[in-house]
Curated annotation (Swiss-Prot):
Function: Putative RNA-binding protein. May be involved in regulating gene expression during embryonic development.
Subcellular location(s) per record: Cytoplasm
Modified residues (N6-acetyllysine): 400
Tissue expression remark: In the adult, predominantly expressed in heart and kidney. In 8 week old mice, expressed in growing primary oocytes and in the stromal cells of the theca.
Renumbered residue ranges of the record's region Disordered: 1-43, 590-622, 667-702, 794-848
Domain of life, per lineage: Eukaryota
Protein name (record): Protein bicaudal C homolog 1
Native species: Mus musculus (Mouse)
Length: 977
């Protein structure tokens, strides 16, 4: 084998001066002249043969050592006896150096008649042979990490070889060839030792995490890695931290370097460093890492049509980028980006897809039926090749697979050789490197369970056969290793064109979900029931596309949820749907209130299923809509406003008994606040008109939906005429908008656990989801959209048409105005329309603008009068965040807060100051300078009444009040959902 016949540079470097003659002493010593003369007549005989083979070095050394100590027969006696019994000549290395550093097995040469040679070889091998139990494993380790694995002076790899009893060979060619580097590392030894050495090598690999530190440079120099705080993090978590200034721009790249066998500490240290350097921005800064994978393996690892990588990205949440094959410089570097947990997990899964080759010898007289080989390949997800060795009476067996399937490779060897055991136990191969945290067994493999074994990698045949036949029920993860068909490699000819081969058995163990969920949920705070609902879990047994942001599968039902330390165990049972699964709305039942209450220490409020959590909510009629968009708040800190919201809702119930179903957190399909559920969805898309609704419910269910929709429509028409309900509904909406603004402006507390909920779902308060984007999404869903800016005549006709049909208002219109869609006219009296140009009409327009704004601060100016000095009158005693919120510059608030710049200091800034702060966008600087100019000019008028005449720049083009046009998929591209 190559690894045994070619000396590695490590082994060569370790050889001592006394072993320079080792090669000669390993070679057989020729017989005496008398022996050669006696054998001369037989040299030309047709029956004469000569065979050269290797014997186990350790056993031969032990034989010579025992003879030297007088405890056994010497090598001379052993070979002489065989020569006499078989009438052969045997040449063996009698001068073998005992205890030499060389691990190479010496050769024995036997000469004589063919039958005699065969008999002599059997006698020798019965004592000195271990080749039948010796294997060679070839694995991929990036050449850039070889020195890290070897260690200083070879100390790391020496210890691995001593502990495992294996010889590990690194490629010699890397020292001289600068263009092409080999990543292949060979391990030779006993199966258990080889597998243990493979896992140990993976643990020795470096783990490097990087992130970009924003806003450094002039005002904030690059942090010093020698500061006490950073040194404390470095020493506590055994990592090294370095900073590199980015050229031509602000910011710095932070690199955290640790070891794979210390993964948890590296992740914790990186999180601590992020928190220390970035503060509240830590959660928004992505972390990246990279893997060096040989370019020839990229297509294999990506899978057919990239299915393998897509599944890993969908499962972990990390972004994976393979380089352009035409790029000569970085053609082997794969980039990963995401959260700390997702990046590390995706890295593990990618390394589990690296190719692995197991080689061993088989006796020549062993014959294996090709059908048996094919069955083994299908069952064990491996490729098997058996070839005769030239000039040797044995066969060479090659087994190929991927690293996450290493155990099955040894299982294939056991079956081929007819052994009782594979020689490798599960405990031997388990390590943090070989098995990601949370997987109790290598067979619990998300890639294989999703049909992404070697078939999914695009190189296997069309047939599949499951090794596991237990019919356990479907779970969130089909976690057992579904088997696939044989891998076609270059050694077996051209690969046969195959179709996608989905797994036959989607089986899962009882612990399939309970051992996995924390892989996708980084902490207990994000593993609440609401977050599971919002995550929209697709079926992994099929290649179902991930749902658009805010859409959740219809048939996902939550049964129970238990908290055990930091791990969340849950069982999600439901119908596993094919790729065309439907997604339905997320009902705003009291689940949200239960989750909210549990976060504030209320022991009576336990998170439970829908049936126990919402005794007041109506039955399954709450899921009739086809789609609903969910707007998530930008800063979901509810500790400061949850009590206020619940108190407000309680007061609403006391003041109006008929509003018992109007509560935001208990609103269902029949609630009076139907606009809460449907604010961002098509108001006309009822159960009787939606094509998806017809597909959802067969027969009687469809009739029940129609009846519920009709009842709801009549109820809303009746309630729309009641001024009490109208005022309460408007009051609720405005109060909730104010509370939402306070929640977004509230500074997060480091020690506070912040849990996303659906409290503000569907109300359009989110700063990260502009109103214009929502309108574009509604337009994409075939909802008619009327522009907000109309001419005087269009506005007049619109007002008249709205006031002429009360029924139209009650049933909900396609207007962009929230009041009109919910049957609320200006001041509750929509039947009286004001004449064109009258103050009443202007007031109505301002109210429409107020309730159509994307957040509370955007709409304040509309309530101060058209002639008022909006900017100054709205910000009496206000602070800088509110001003930026009004100007649409909210994303720069953190920059100014970090530099401790308040409103008074802001008024003194110049264009150059803004540039030094990192405000590089011209439009943003222009808005800020205009605001500074306007506020400075009118500082004396800040406390004048609102009707003081002054010109507000916000009413002009600089304010950005004109409707902005967004691409329909801007929200998905921005990644801020």
């Amino acid at each position: 084998m190559a690894s045994q016949s070619e000396p590695g540079y490590l082994a060569a470097a370790q050889s001592d001066p006394g072993s320079n003659s080792e090669r000669s002493t390993d070679s057989p010593v020729a017989g005496s002249e008398d022996d050669l003369v006696a054998a001369a007549p037989l040299l030309h005989s047709p029956e004469w043969s000569e065979e050269r083979f290797r014997v186990d070095r350790k056993k031969l050394e032990a034989m010579l050592q025992a003879a030297a100590e007088g405890k056994g027969r010497s090598g001379e006696d052993f070979f002489q006896k065989i020569m006499e019994e078989t009438n052969t000549q045997i040449a063996w290395p009698s001068k073998l150096k005992i205890g030499a550093k060389s691990k190479k097995d010496p050769h024995i040469k036997v000469s004589g008649k063919k039958e005699d040679v065969k008999e002599a070889k059997e006698m020798i091998m019965s004592v000195l042979d271990t080749k039948s139990n010796r294997v060679t494993l070839k694995m991929d380790v990036s050449h850039t990490e070889h020195s890290h694995v070897i260690g200083k002076g070879g100390n790391n790899i020496k210890k691995v070889m001593e502990d495992t009893g294996c010889h590990i060979h690194f490629p010699d060619s890397n020292r001289n060839n600068q263009a092409e580097k080999s990543n292949q590392v060979s391990i030779a030894g006993q199966p258990a030792g080889v597998e243990s050495a493979r896992a140990r090598i993976r643990e020795l690999l470096p783990l490097v995490l990087m992130f970009e530190l924003p806003i450094a440079g002039i005002l904030q120099p690059v942090p010093d890695p020698n500061t006490p705080s950073i040194q404390h993090i470095s020493q506590t978590y055994s990592v090294s931290v370095s900073f590199k200034q980015r050229s031509r721009m602000y910011g710095a790249t932070v690199t955290v370097r640790g070891s794979q066998n210390n993964t948890n500490a590296v992740k914790e240290g990186t999180a601590m460093l992020l928190e220390h350097l970035a503060g509240s921005l830590a959660s928004a800064i992505p972390v990246s890492t990279q893997l060096d994978i040989a370019a020839q393996h990229h297509l294999f690892m990506m899978g057919r049509n990239g299915s393998n990588v897509k599944h890993i990205m969908q499962r972990t949440g990390a972004q994976i980028h393979f380089p352009d094959p035409s790029n000569p410089q970085k053609k082997s570097t794969v980039y990963l980006q995401g959260t700390i947990e997702s990046v590390c997990l995706a890295r593990q899964y990618l390394m589990g897809c690296l190719p692995l080759v197991l080689m061993f010898d088989m006796k020549e007289d062993i014959e294996v039926d090709p059908q048996v080989i094919a069955q083994l390949m299908e069952q064990l997800d491996v490729f098997i090749s058996i070839k005769p060795k030239p000039k040797q009476p044995s066969k060479s067996v090659i087994v190929k697979s991927v690293e996450r399937n290493a155990l099955n490779m040894y299982e294939a060897r056991k079956c081929l050789l007819g052994l009782e055991s594979s020689g490798v136990s599960i405990a031997t191969s388990l390590s943090p490197a070989s098995c990601p945290a949370g997987l109790a067994c290598p067979s619990l493999d998300i890639l294989a369970s999703a049909g992404l074994g070697l078939t999914g990698l695009g190189l296997l045949g069309p047939t599949t056969l499951s090794l596991n036949t237990s019919a356990t029920p479907n779970s969130l993860l089909n976690a057992l290793n579904t088997s696939v068909s044989p891998l076609q490699s270059s050694s077996s000819g051209t690969p046969s064109p195959t179709l996608w081969a989905p797994p036959i058995a989607n089986t899962a163990s009882a612990t399939g979900f309970s051992t996995i969920p924390h892989l996708m949920l980084p902490s207990t705070a994000q593993a609440t029931l609401t977050n599971i609902l919002l995550s929209g879990v697709p079926t992994y047994g099929h290649t179902a596309p991930s749902p658009p942001p805010g859409l959740t599968p219809v048939d996902v039902h939550i049964n129970s949820m238990q908290t055990e330390g930091k791990n969340i165990s849950a069982s999600i049972n439901g119908h596993v749907q094919p790729a065309n699964m439907k997604y339905g709305p997320l009902s705003t039942s009291s689940l949200g209130e239960k989750v909210l209450s549990s976060n504030h220490g209320d022991p009576s409020m336990q998170t439970a299923g829908p049936e126990q959590a919402s005794p007041k909510s109506n039955s399954v009629e709450g899921c009739n809509d086809a789609f609903v968009e969910v707007g998530m708040p930008r800063s979901p800190s509810h500790s400061g406003n949850a009590g206020d919201l619940k108190q407000m809702l309680g007061a609403s119930k006391v003041s109006c008994a008929k509003r018992q179903t109007v509560e935001l957190l208990q609103g269902t399909k029949n609630s009076h606040l139907h606009g809460t559920d449907r604010l961002l969805s098509d108001p006309e898309l009822s159960a009787t008109e939606s094509p998806l609704a017809d597909k959802k419910a067969p027969g009687s269910e469809r009739a029940a939906e129609r009846a519920a929709a009709a009842q709801q429509k009549s109820e809303r028409a009746r309630l729309a005429s009641q001024p009490t309900y109208v005022h309460m509904q408007a009051f609720d909406y405005e109060q909730k908008k104010l509370l939402a603004t306070k929640a977004m402006l509230k500074k997060p507390v480091v020690t506070e656990v912040r849990t996303p909920t659906n409290t503000w779902s569907g109300l359009g308060f989110s700063k990260s989801m502009p109103a214009e984007t929502i309108k574009e999404l509604r337009r994409a869903n075939h909802v008619s959209y009327k522009p907000t800016m109309t001419t005087a005549y269009e506005g007049s006709s619109l007002s008249l048409s709205r006031s002429s049909s009360r029924e139209h208002l009650a049933s909900g219109s396609e207007s962009d105005n929230w009041r009109d869609r919910n049957g609320i006219g200006p001041m509750g009296h929509s039947e009286f329309s004001a004449p064109i140009g009258s103050p009443k009409r202007k007031q109505n327009k301002s109210r429409e603008h107020y309730l159509s704004s994307s957040n509370y601060m955007d709409c304040i100016s509309s309530l101060t009068g058209s002639n008022g000095c909006n900017l100054n009158s709205c910000f009496k005693g206000s602070d800088l965040p509110e001003l930026f919120s009004k100007l649409g510059l909210g994303k720069y608030t953190d920059v100014f807060q970090q530099q401790e710049i308040d409103l008074q200091t802001f008024l003194t800034l110049t264009d150059q100051d803004l540039k030094e702060l990192g405000i590089t966008t011209f439009g943003a600087r222009r808005k800020m300078l205009l605001a500074i100019s306007e506020l400075s000019k009118n500082r004396r008028k800040l406390f004048e009444p609102p009707n003081a005449s002054c010109t507000s720049f916000l009413e002009g083009g600089a304010s950005g009040r004109l409707p902005r046009q967004y691409h329909s998929d801007i929200a998905s591209v921005s990644g801020r959902w």
